[in-house]
Amino acid sequence: IANKAIWVAKKRYMMNVFDEEGIRFDIPKLKIMGVEAVKSSTPEVCRGKIKDAIRVIMNDSEDALIKFVADFKEVFKTLSPEEVAFPRSCNYLDKYVDPNSIYKKGTPIHVKGALIYNHYILKNKLQRKYPLIKDGDKIKFLMLRQPNTVKDTVVSFATKIPYEFDLHKYVDYETQFTKTFTDPLRFVLDSI
């Protein structure tokens, strides 16, 4: 039994549940299926905040949601690049390598970032300090502002961005925030 529910698409919904299979809740439990708040490809910090935003959507006003988003945006800009990066699995690196230009046209963005990372690790002779990304690795990728030291809009990494790349000041927090937080929320709000 739920007092509110939003269906975004088939198998993608959120509900304010008061009674689930005979178990009653004093405070409604938020049940979420198929939305970015529960997807592993969303940064962990955003998963929690998307759930909180959905709670605000279900139980509060539009003004409260606007304030919540604005407050989180300020916090988001202070987080480390590693915290705001998109997690992904990396496969088929060999398929997309181009010896002339690092990567081929049509390369998925996270693979492109991994190939750029590997290129600059080898170019700067940092392979003893940082492991190369290989097929099957769990990685994170970030959008970058240009111009920057890797001359591209993305970089991937395994655990942290090598400080030798000098990229921390080029992280595109606006794009990261839009893609990791506001776009998933907009998808929910558009269906209301």
Regions found by a protein language model. Give the residues of each.
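DNA-dependent DNA polymerase catalytic subunits
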Residues: 2-192
